[in-house]
A protein has these predicted regions:
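Active-site glycine-centered loops adjacent to acidic/histidine catalytic or metal-binding residues
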Residues: 120, 259, 302, 345
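A glycine-centered loop/beta-turn motif at secondary-structure junctions
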Residues: 331-368
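Beta-strand-turn-beta hairpins that frame and shape the catalytic cleft
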Residues: 178-184, 292-295, 334-339
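Residues that mark the start of a beta-strand
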Residues: 181-185, 205, 254, 297, ...
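RNA-binding accessory domains that recognize and position tRNA/RNA substrates
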Residues: 2-216, 220-221, 235, 349, ...
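Cysteine-nucleophile active-site neighborhood
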Residues: 225, 229-297, 303-308, 351-366
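Proline-centered loop/turn at the N-terminus of a beta-strand
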Residues: 114, 183, 254-256, 272, ...
Length: 368
């Protein structure tokens, strides 16, 4: 199929600091707002767009071509697109791949995703890298900059924003065979499908619980262990979930946290979190495993991180992984309980396989 690039209608990208970029409309015609961020991955745009951790964010795709291989049902990480918008250099409203079932253009239109193309994405990435994360607005229907500034001024900062309730399940549900060897309670803060797949593939029966689940509801399930999922937003404001996790730690059962789950686990142990300058988003972030001394290439998507100074004051917590680019904390474990977590995504698909062993470590804790 011949690839086509939509380039008919003008679109505007306005950043919170007043910087303006002009391009062409992609996806649905309209206006959208969110926090601007960038992903340096070269593939996997459908998985990125459906990742609940991106809720409330407008993603710059550093890869030049987006949409050229279409979309396909098996490559989703949730039941709908979760990004607020997308920025790219070249947007294909046609596609060339045998397995693809639809174009990205139609996919965006169905989920009302407003985007902009034909902009210099690399210069925008450098700008955001240097200036830091900030809110932005994309519009393919409003051309007045002052009107856009007024709309953008109403958008809340990601700092202090609770977003898991927007993407987590509202009711509990089960996945896998009830005859499986292990029972896992998954606390859903915006869980990715591949986390669930990674557990069921390891002979686990899962029950996924919504936010505001009580300790009694979890203990009544009599799980062998607990999975703390990924998700969007600022972990520090999720006080109910932090208290619940603290209570789960005290049960002594195995716990594995990923991304937001990692941050909430840290908060439950008195470790603070803070907003990063620009965050980590991509599929090639180098992380050192301090236990083995090996370097792992990891997939990441987070704008908050845990405070290393607080960990240094806590004799019960051990740092297990650090980022080799900026030395931020990427993994921790408790010294006296089978509890550990990582900031990155060992389940990532597409992405490196270096850290899949963490699921096996969790299973090993269940078997003890």
């Amino acid at each position: 199929m011949q690839l086509k690039y939509q380039s008919k209608q003008k679109a505007i990208l306005l950043l919170e600091d007043g910087k303006v970029f002009e391009g062409k409309a992609a996806g649905k015609i309209g206006t959208t707002t969110g926090e601007i961020c960038f992903n340096t991955g070269m593939t996997g745009y459908q998985e990125i767009f459906t990742d609940p951790s991106y809720f409330g964010q407008i993603v710059i795709m550093n890869n030049v071509h987006v949409g050229n291989y279409g979309v396909e049902e098996s490559e989703i990480e949730s039941d709908s697109i979760k990004i607020s918008g997308m920025i790219c250099k070249k947007f294909s409203d046609g596609f060339s791949r045998k397995r693809a079932t639809d174009s990205l253009q139609h996919y965006f239109e169905k989920d009302n995703i407003v985007s902009i193309s034909d902009v210099d994405t690399r210069s925008i990435v450098r700008y955001v890298r240097d200036k830091g994360a900030m809110n932005c607005i994309i519009s393919s229907e409003i051309t007045d900059i002052e009107e856009l500034k007024a709309l953008l001024a109403k958008v809340p900062s990601m700092n202090g924003l609770e977003l898991s309730s927007k993407v987590a399940t509202k009711t509990a549900y089960e996945i896998g065979e009830k005859t499986a060897k292990y029972k896992i309670a998954v606390l859903d803060f915006g869980v990715k499908k591949n986390i669930l797949r990674s557990l069921t593939q390891r002979d686990c029966f899962l029950k996924v619980f919504p936010l505001k689940t009580t300790l009694k509801e979890l203990t009544d399930f009599n799980a062998d262990g607990y999975m703390l999922s990924n998700g969007p937003g600022d972990p520090s404001v999720m006080t109910d979930e932090i208290l619940l996790i603290k209570q789960l730690v005290e049960t002594g059962k195995p716990i594995f946290g990923i991304c937001l789950g990692h941050q909430l686990l840290a908060q439950s142990q008195g470790i603070s979190t803070y907003k990063m300058h620009a965050g980590h988003r991509g599929i090639n972030h180098p992380v050192k495993n301090i236990i083995t001394g090996k370097c792992e290439i990891t997939s990441q998507n987070h704008g908050f991180t845990v405070n290393a100074d607080d960990i240094a004051k806590n004799s019960n917590i051990e740092i297990t992984h650090v980022n080799l680019n900026d030395h931020t904390i990427e993994g921790i474990r408790l010294k006296n309980k089978p509890v550990f977590s990582v900031q990155y995504h060992p389940e990532a698909c597409p992405g490196p396989l270096d850290s899949r062993y963490l699921f096996d470590d969790f299973i090993a804790n269940l078997a003890k």
